[in-house]
Amino acid sequence: MTHISTWIDEYHKGSRFGLNGEILIKQNSKYQEIIVIENEYYGRALMLDGCWMTSLKDEKYYHECLVHPALSSIDEKSNVLIIGGGDGGTARECVKYPQISKIDLVEIDEEVIKISKKFLKEIGGEAWSDKRLKIHIDDGVQWVKKTRDNFYDVIFIDCSDPSELSNLLFSDSFYRECKRILTKNGILATQSESPESFKNIHISILKTLKKFFRVSETMYSFVPIYPSGIWSWTFASEEVLHLSKRNCNEALRIEKSCEIWNLNFQNAAFKMMPNKIVKELNS
């Protein structure tokens, strides 16, 4: 059988990042074009509507950084909500915590889940068979609207970059509703874009979260497959966040299972805000 290699590129502001390899699947869902390619270095990689979402090589930079600063620092974590996350990586990191009773994963595009289960099995791993994980094919904005007050202990927003499909996940009204359905000590954890490639969106997210939550903190790290390679995650709450704990038994247990995240990595990442972002936030 002949394997045909081709280049697949993401274009961004006059630059492009491409992977060469065999296209394993290319199809249009109800919402977007979905491609999975097999690359010699990055392994299998997922692209949605021309944007790289994840790859087997570097997905843990993203998923471990989104999940563990929140879950390792909060005592009560019975109910967890994941908005997006159809590749399964965020759920995989969540199921490491036995205290969690239920994980609602709300993904608008069922095809992303189906394709991830088939072609990117390593990312979701055991999460797909964990009985605590409940999958809902639904609009995340509408799901949050119909959820009762003070229900979730942690909300993860694991969505794609702002687009026609996801714009409302970055809106004031959405963050306000997320705050409403969080418990008193709950944490909202969201990917907050790149301070380089998506600077204006990044600053907008940070300012909006500061408007609705008493406390918010942002960490920076690397996701090589994304434009510019630097990414961010922001954590917001009404209570003081304990994201810089150095002696946390929960964190020490979890980091043994991680490739990227540990407490030292996290503590440094929370101190990496570029000065141009600091100036913008203070202006």
UniProtKB/Swiss-Prot annotation:
> What Gene3D superfamilies does this protein map onto?
Spermidine synthase, tetramerisation domain, Vaccinia Virus protein VP39
Coarsely, its chief localization is: cytoplasm
Reactions catalysed according to its record? S-adenosyl 3-(methylsulfanyl)propylamine + putrescine = S-methyl-5'-thioadenosine + spermidine + H(+)
Q: Where in the cell is it found?
A: Cytoplasm
Known pathway:
Amine and polyamine biosynthesis; spermidine biosynthesis; spermidine from putrescine: step 1/1
Q: Which residues bind spermidine?
A: H63, D87, D158, C159, S160, D161
Keyword Metal-binding attached: no
- Per the UniProt entry, the Enzyme Commission number(s) are 2.5.1.16
Drop me one GO molecular function for this one.
spermidine synthase activity
UniProt keyword Disulfide bond present = no
Broadest EC class assigned to this enzyme? transferase
- Identify the catalytic residues: D158
One of the record's GO cellular component terms: cytoplasm
Q: A single Pfam family, by name?
A: Spermine_synth
Q: Which family does it belong to?
A: Belongs to the spermidine/spermine synthase family.
NCBIfam families reported in the protein's UniProt record? PRK00811.1 (NF002010)
Protein name stated in the entry: Polyamine aminopropyltransferase
Provide the species name: Prochlorococcus marinus (strain MIT 9312)
